[in-house]
């Protein structure tokens, strides 16, 4: 499909009217027709019909259908019309049983699917797709089988690999499937949602400059040069101003640093302030704003050293006043609501400094973003469970029902306000625990060396030099 056609249509679509442009599927949807070039017979009177609509799972999409009256050539294409997420997503699923093959998967056009055990990768494509894990593997088997008929010289090798893919469908041994999508719009279904899935791990990451460029979010060379000059100036100004002096006044002083916008790639300004939470510790509040695209975000980073033990904080919410308690959820903490069997794993929400009511509202909004709970294509049982959970959350937010909220933080950087401080709060329970080896490993503490690291570095350098000299000697022989 010609990029000219797409750009021409998008130029005519105003951003502020996006919600009106992308309507739910119905017979009343407006179809735009554009005269376009036929790549088959080179006629210039082909017709491209464009439909902007909303489809379950895919949110907003653009449907393109081309027909040439001269030669009869037809083609169709579907593209995502929704906005990119603020961060990319890396999804890992451990397939341990045949039932896992039925999980639905949304692969957007910028996503890469890989199976590490076979060193197999499905690269980004022009079109997004909605499928199951089994469907993705069967589609790969079909494509490789067809390729073996064309490339006869490597037929045996391709068919051997097809056999390996077919064996995966038996799930005789567990295997891992990974979806990496810099646009952040791909999903793998969690059938236990909103409960945590031990076999599913989702990590959000900040896109690189190359990934932003591939999404069309990059900046041109002139802007890059200007940013480099500005950053050099800011470095000279900031180097002396960022060092935080001692004293209470410094804790309230706001510091600014240049930072690249993860949404559009243009340099914006990140403001930071160091402050204290009574009866807890110092925290760093960071707020970023971009004058170019208007993107704004904020983040909380607790200060101080990593605690020796983890901590579980349990609050029994019994009144409207409890909903107003301050709560700090660090980016390493899990949020658990036992009454609904909800567990929001660390990394899902990031660091949040809000109230109990605010945190419950954020959890509800995150649930509403899950495409497998919405639309007429969703499973009826999942949809009913989702509606029940959101109804219960609304009751909690309105203060109509008591509930329990629990923060499980392996590095003790989370906090819930004690209304009776410095005395004990009868509704608040705090329990410290020893971290497991796996938790320390995930936090990078097992590999951390804080003693004699200079000597260890010298030993590693000497070992590397010895290995190089041995390789040279063996090559000379």
Swiss-Prot record:
Residues 213-243, 442-477 are annotated as: Disordered. One of its GO terms (biological process) is protein folding. Keywords: Metal-binding, Nucleus, Repeat, Zinc, Zinc-finger. Signal peptide: none annotated. The keyword Metal-binding applies. One of its GO terms (molecular function) is zinc ion binding. GO terms for cellular component: cytoplasm; nucleus. It is found in: Nucleus. Residues 447-457 have a biased composition (Polar residues). A zinc finger (C4-type) spans 38-71, 261-293. NCBIfam families: ZPR1_znf. This is Zinc finger protein ZPR1 homolog. The gene is zpr1.
